Amino acid sequence: MKQAPARIGYLGPIGTFTQQALVGEPDLQSAEHLPFRTVADVLDAVQSGDVDLGFVPIENSIEGTVNYTQDALVFDYNLLIQREVVIDIELCLLVRPGTKLAQIDEIHSMPVATAQCHGFLRSNLPTADIRITNSTAEAAKIVSESTGLNTAAVAPRNAADVYGLDVIAENIADQEGNQTRFVLVGKENIPAPTGNDRTAIVVFQRADEPGSLLAILQEFAARRINLSQLLSRPTKRGGLGNYCFIMYADGHISDELVADALRDLHAKQGDVKFMGSYPAAVKHAQNTREHADARWREADDWVSELRSQIAR
């Protein structure tokens, strides 16, 4: 993406990890960054054209998929992922100046963040009430506006500077190596291939029967396409047991083998939603993809040569 779009909506308010990840993208820094209260608000703004692109969290290395983002992209919006961004996450406990740990009986944050710090909170603040917010920065803002010295927020360190809070405990996540993946989404356009890309699709099964998932996976295995992520989510229709499969595959739709796999899936399964081909944040095994593509082209040429010999 050579030129930054005019307006990018992101999960706000100011001070979220989402904003931190967004401003870390050099080619997007000159765009107008507009905070929204919820992920749905961001995606609504993209769908309506109020902003050009949206930037939202979609996966955490400790807690897994951010389901409300994933489900919204699968079921509620027709948007395309333009890129992904992965950043390291350090969660801190933020308080109003003068607050002591023993005084805290109310903790604000979003569910994904408090879940990542469950062990710390259980050991140090076992009786504190957990109050749900839409973002970690919103939690910090709420604490900054409180009048007592009994509230705290699980939030980024930079939110302390934004909202005038103190860091009473740092790096409180239960596991090391905490990272979050964010995606940039838009209404149209598939980015050009970079040689290190991912393709996201959703497959709705034509029939729930033995071997149905295996048949889907074989389309990728037969072409030596690596699936970096496979998720099953309820389709939200037809009661229990109705699931779709969200798949993230290494490669770009411009790759012959990826395109061929999607073509076969569409023909055999019928209901396949394309969610984008875009630059991957993590380097994958490119040599395997290049060799597989070369073998596919050679095989295609061989079949074409044989077919050219058919009597007219």
Kindly label every feature range from the protein language model.
Residues M1-R312:
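Domain-level signature for soluble enzymes in the chorismate/prephenate branch of the shikimate pathway
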